[in-house]
């Protein structure tokens, strides 16, 4: 399916993405502070189980446990020598889960997160960052990824390098920013607005643009509206389950699955072609969105 276009994917209407992965890993025993991507090699059954839980909840698209699998991030966990293996296996595990869907086609987009290095401060060169993305995405393609999502982006320059790396390898790519900074909480950490981010993503060659994380799903209607004003690319929206609160030392989110689903429908009505969940969401939230979409 690596030769498909997003228009083929969207022929039957909006597509449902998966939800959060981190808390699902913690439920399965991932220690706080441990790097989840290492589980692709150390605990693959748990990784596949999380992916399968979203397939069973009704996701049309699931991601991969590769968000922090660039050479820069893995070096912090003494795993830089396992880049290819971790990325390839992460995709393979999601593909295995997707293949178990009954009577429908579930696609897999490989997750590519920020490198953690600062281009603006001269920590590394753009060429080094681009090469790191090519290295990561090559392994994801080898694992069978149907495309890539460059997510939780704050730096449009880094995002553009990742998009161009994916396109150089012939893959579909979604560019997704996180807008929770600034006086109005509507900019990325590096100051990009939804409009400027969407324009930069389109110029870099992204097949779809959007947002994930940062704030609750209820704030994503505005992000949709602002991006629609400047781009005709399909919109990808993956919001959090409301606002986080500390309860007995643990972070909990204040949204219910039903409330989340109602907000997700508003995001779709505003023009989103892809909708799902991020922090605080789980398979119950995605199942609720599935039911709401099917009942329209």
Describe each PLM feature range.
Residues 1-296:
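Domain-level signal for soluble alpha/beta catalytic cores
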């Amino acid at each position: 399916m690596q030769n498909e276009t997003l228009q083929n994917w969207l022929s039957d209407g909006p597509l449902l993405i998966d939800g959060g992965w981190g808390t699902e890993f913690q439920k399965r025993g991932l220690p706080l502070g441990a790097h989840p991507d290492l589980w692709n090699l150390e605990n693959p059954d748990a990784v596949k189980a999380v992916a399968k839980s979203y397939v069973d909840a009704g996701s049309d698209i699931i991601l991969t446990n590769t968000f922090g699998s660039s050479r820069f991030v893995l070096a912090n966990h003494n795993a830089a020598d396992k880049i290819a293996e971790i990325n390839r296996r992460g995709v393979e595990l999601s593909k295995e889960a997707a293949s178990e869907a009954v009577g429908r086609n579930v696609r897999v987009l490989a997750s590519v997160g920020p490198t953690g290095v600062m281009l603006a401060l001269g920590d590394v060169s753009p060429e080094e960052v681009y090469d790191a993305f090519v290295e990561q995405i090559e392994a994801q393609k080898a694992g069978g990824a149907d495309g890539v999502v460059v997510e939780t982006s704050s730096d449009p320059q880094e995002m553009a390098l990742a998009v161009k790396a994916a396109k150089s390898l012939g893959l579909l790519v979604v560019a997704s920013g996180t807008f929770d900074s600034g006086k109005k909480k509507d900019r990325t950490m590096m100051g990009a607005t939804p409009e400027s981010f969407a324009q930069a993503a389109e110029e870099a060659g992204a097949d779809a643009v959007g947002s994930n994380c940062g704030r609750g799903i209820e704030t994503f209607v505005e992000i949709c509206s602002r991006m629609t004003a400047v781009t005709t690319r399909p919109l990808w929206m993956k919001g959090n389950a409301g606002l986080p609160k500390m309860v007995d030392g643990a972070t909990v989110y204040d949204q219910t699955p039903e409330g989340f689903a109602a907000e997700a429908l508003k995001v779709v009505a505003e023009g989103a072609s892809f909708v799902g969940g991020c922090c605080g969401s789980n398979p119950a939230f995605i199942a609720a969105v599935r039911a709401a979409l099917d009942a329209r």
